From Swiss-Prot:
Membrane topology (UniProt): Multi-pass membrane protein
Annotated keywords: Cell membrane, Iron, Membrane, Metal-binding, Transmembrane, Transmembrane helix
UniProt name for this protein: PPE family protein PPE37
Compartments where found: Cell membrane
Knockout consequences: Deletion of the gene results in a strain severely attenuated in HIA. The ppe37 genes with frameshift mutations are incapable of complementing BCG's HIA defect, indicating that they are non-functional.
Regions crossing the membrane: 227-247, 250-270
One GO process term, biological-process aspect: response to host iron concentration
Miscellaneous field: Significant genetic variability exists in ppe37 genes across different M.tuberculosis strains, with more than 60% of sequences from completely sequenced M.tuberculosis genomes having mutations that result in altered PPE37 proteins. These altered PPE37 proteins are non-functional in HIA.
Motif (Iron-binding motif): 203-206
Primary subcellular site in the record, as a coarse category: membrane
Protein family according to the UniProt entry: Belongs to the mycobacterial PPE family.
Length: 473
């Protein structure tokens, strides 16, 4: 309240304020506390200075000792400054207490004011025919004097209190004693977001209070400052802090996951998992198969004929055997008691590539079918005898055979044009049937290596040459 405002207040109001208040006792107690704090600051600063001097004079020498002394020097200066501030605050409280005492002494008392009112009432009551006009005027003038005196005293007391508060310096925060590396390591941890928000809110309110005091002098600025002080104290209180943590913590920690709880936005959050459909599982083991079908081309010239011996001498027939189209294993002339002798196989394939030992039933069935094909054309007993001998041969065979390699995706065989298996003989037409044909005398192409078809441990012997090549060339 400024000086003109105190003249609008009756003297009874400020007199009652000063007379019924706490008096100068709390201000003097605060001044004594500030003096004690200043003495403690001074004592600690003196002790720290003696410790630093002892460190420099002791056996601890070197860069670490120098860093210790240098790190504590700002703190010692701060202790000295804090002692000065505490002394100034104590003096300010003493000045405010003195101003209060002076204001209380210069303020018209409530008894004087009450006596003036009583005198004025008596004079007015006994004022017959205007005999008390002058005493009443004097009484009113005295009351006006007390009014002006109360306003003047309160204005002076307000000025003294304001100057005392403004003259009190503020204490800065204590400097850090640890090194910058330790400070950065200590501050590297992520702060509490709710605490940070509360601190920002208090800083904003304090900024508003500072602007209100500086830009709005007078009653309006004081009113806004008091309201902001109440808000700052409420924000700093435990109730608002509890409510802030209760509201802000779920929003901070669980707010980013809120779209996942919505049935409308959940498909949009799971669209990133759609690419997992293109990821295939581990591939299964590769199963190697051995095809029973041989290559489509002829790998070795067919035998010129097969001699079949039966139980009936009249049924003995010598005919040239047609070259098989699917098997490259020709049959040799048979002897009594056996359908055919085991011949040579033309085995083709890439260098260094072995044959899979799991070629069991499929390869065996192909060879048996090719061996039994000519016997199927024989009449009667020869066909049965050949079939039974082929069966016995199949039983005696082992579970490993040399067979043609098929295209399994790892090897691509060169394609060669197919050639006719038989051609017309040069002797003319003798008898109808297979007797008038002979194997084609055209040279065959070398497609592999010759190999004996007997033992499992046989190795490749010599390269296969066309039958028209002379060994002397």
């Amino acid at each position: 309240m400024t000086f003109p405002m105190w003249f609008a207040v009756p003297p009874e109001v400020p007199s009652a304020w000063l007379s019924t208040g706490m008096g100068p006792g709390p201000l003097l107690a605060a001044a004594r506390a500030w003096h004690a704090l200043a003495a403690q600051y001074t004592e600690i600063a003196t002790e720290l200075a003696s410790v630093l001097a002892a460190v420099q004079a002791s056996s601890w020498q070197g860069p670490s000792a120098d860093r210790f002394v240098v790190a504590h020097q700002p703190f010692r200066y701060w202790l000295t400054h804090a002692a000065t501030v505490a002394t100034a605050a104590a003096a300010a409280h003493e000045t405010a207490a003195a101003g209060y005492t002076s204001a209380l002494g210069g303020m018209p008392t409530l008894a004087e004011l009450a006596a003036n009112h009583a005198m004025h009432g008596a004079l007015v009551t006994t004022n017959f025919f205007g005999v008390n006009t002058i005493p009443i005027a004097l009484n009113e003038a005295d009351y006006l004097r007390m009014w002006i005196q109360a306003a003047t005293v309160m204005s002076h007391y307000q000025a003294v209190a304001h100057e005392s508060v403004a003259a009190t310096p503020s204490t800065p925060p204590a400097p850090q004693i640890v090194t910058s590396a330790a400070s950065s390591a200590a501050s590297s941890s992520f702060p509490d977001p709710t605490k940070l928000i509360l601190q920002l809110l208090k800083d904003f309110l304090e900024l508003l209070r500072y602007l209100a005091v500086e830009l709005l002098p007078g009653p309006l600025g004081d009113l806004i400052a008091q309201v902001l002080d109440w808000f700052i104290s409420f924000v700093s209180g435990p109730v608002f802090t509890f409510l802030a943590y209760l509201v802000l913590d779920p929003l901070i920690y669980f707010g980013p996951f809120a779209p996942l709880t919505s049935p409308v936005l959940l498909p949009a959050g799971l669209t990133g998992l759609a690419g997992l459909g293109a990821v295939s599982g581990p591939a299964g083991p590769m199963v190697e198969r051995v095809h029973s079908d041989g290559p489509s081309r002829q790998s070795w010239p067919a035998a010129t004929g097969v001699t079949l011996v039966g139980t009936n001498p009249a049924a003995l027939v010598t005919t040239p055997a047609p070259a098989p189209t699917t098997s490259a294993a020709p049959t040799a002339p048979s002897t009594p008691g056996s359908s055919a002798a085991q011949g040579l196989y033309a085995v083709g394939g890439p260098d260094g590539e072995g044959f899979n030992p799991i070629a069991k039933t499929t390869a065996l069935a192909g060879v048996t079918t090719d061996a039994a094909a000519p016997a199927a054309k024989l009449p009667g007993d020869q066909a049965q005898s050949s079939a039974s001998k082929a069966t016995r041969l199949r039983r005696r065979l082992r579970q490993h055979r040399f067979e043609f390699l098929a295209d399994d995706g790892r090897l691509t065989m060169p394609n060669t044009p197919e050639m006719a298996d038989v051609a017309a003989g040069n002797r003319g037409l003798d008898a109808l049937g297979f007797a008038g044909t002979i194997p084609k005398s055209a040279p065959g192409s070398a497609t592999g290596l010759t190999h004996l078809g007997g033992g499992f441990a046989d190795v490749l012997s010599q390269p296969m040459l066309p039958h028209t090549w002379d060994g002397s060339d």
